[in-house]
Amino acid sequence: MRLSNGLGWVLNEMRRLEDKPCLAYNLNMTIHILKGKATVLQMQEMLVSFPDMRMVKIVVDIENEILAGGSGMHYECEQLLLEDGSKQENLWGANWFPDEQSVEFESLINIRPRQNKSIIIQDENICNEVERITRKFLGDIKP
C-alpha cells in the first residue's frame, strides 16, 4: 500500500530497500579529526561514506586550522569539532574530491543568519581559508 504523503513514500521506500545495501550513505563510516596531514589509510576510511562519488564531506575550523571528515552528513563532523572546542562561527562545510583535488564549498551547515545566507560559502576569504587548510591536510593523498 502506498501512502499519499511524503513521509509515507519514505516509509514505503525504506521497507522496499530494507535488505539492500545503500550505496549513497554507508553507516560503517569513520570520522577523523585532523590537525595535520592525513594518511592514505585515513583518506580511504573517510571515502567509505561515498565510495561511488569518491567524495569526502568535511568541516573546517578556519580559526584553529582543524579539519573533520568522513561522515555522511556535514553536521556530524561539525558536532565533533564543537565537542572538541571549536566555535560555530569558525566552522565551514565543504566537499573534497581527492581524484580531482578539488573543493566544493557547499553544505547546509554554511547557512547562517549573520554570516552566510546560502549553502555555498559566499565570502571569498573564507573560501580561500577552507581551501588552503583542506589542501594542507588532504592534498596529494591518493587513496
Locate the predicted segments by residue:
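Negatively charged, low-complexity tracts enriched in Asp/Glu with abundant Ser/Thr
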Residues: 35-80
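Well-ordered alpha/beta subsegment
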Residues: 124-143
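Intrinsically disordered, low-complexity regulatory segments enriched in Ser/Thr/Pro
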Residues: 98-121
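Amphipathic, interaction-prone secondary-structure segments
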Residues: 70-102
